[in-house]
A protein has these predicted regions:
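Phosphate-end processing signature that detects enzymes handling 5′-triphosphorylated RNA
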Residues: 1-170
Length: 170
């Protein structure tokens, strides 16, 4: 089913205010923090990136993701449309094959790994919403030899509020 998502950046001062607010409002920890590693795919023109920056819909993100540095990877497509966002996810066994050959997408053509993002994610639940908070965000550029090279460490935090696509306001 489609869902709504609101994402925003927080600096250290705003982070403290945000954490105080969600605790005061009764948000509860959903489960333990996890390290999230995502490898994002795009075509040579970086069309998915540009569509995202420009807010074009429909659009999608294609990524491989794993948690806590285990060897189990998920292949995900996240579609944004007028109705909201929708994600498909399936376990993959041929990690190296997808990294080397890429993924042929009907909308964007051949997509290869472009960037790896790694961060520590905290999870909360509040009313019918799920809140995630990402910190220690590191970006790595994917190289032609399929390795990743450190590119940037983000000093900010990213919070996201996710809920079912209903009339209930965030």
């Amino acid at each position: 089913s489609f869902r709504k998502e609101i994402k925003f950046n927080l600096n250290k001062l705003n982070l403290e205010k945000f954490l105080f607010w969600i605790e005061k409002e009764g948000a509860e920890k959903l489960h333990n923090k996890r390290i999230v590693n995502s490898i994002y795919f795009d075509n040579k023109k970086l069309s998915m990136y540009h569509d995202s920056v420009e807010g074009i819909i429909p659009r999608k993100k294609i990524r491989m993701r794993n948690y806590n540095k285990n060897n189990e990877f998920l292949f995900e497509k996240k579609i944004s449309s007028q109705e909201g966002r929708f994600k498909t996810s399936k376990k993959i066994l041929k990690y190296n094959e997808i990294i080397k050959s890429g993924h042929l997408d009907s909308q964007y053509g051949l997509c290869k790994p472009k960037i790896k993002v790694s961060y520590l994610r905290s999870y909360f639940t509040f009313k019918s919403f799920r809140i995630t908070l990402d910190q220690n965000i590191n970006y790595f550029k994917f190289e032609k030899n399929h390795s990743s090279k450190f590119a940037y460490k983000d000093s900010e935090f990213v919070a996201e509020i996710k809920g079912k696509n209903s009339n209930q306001d965030f």
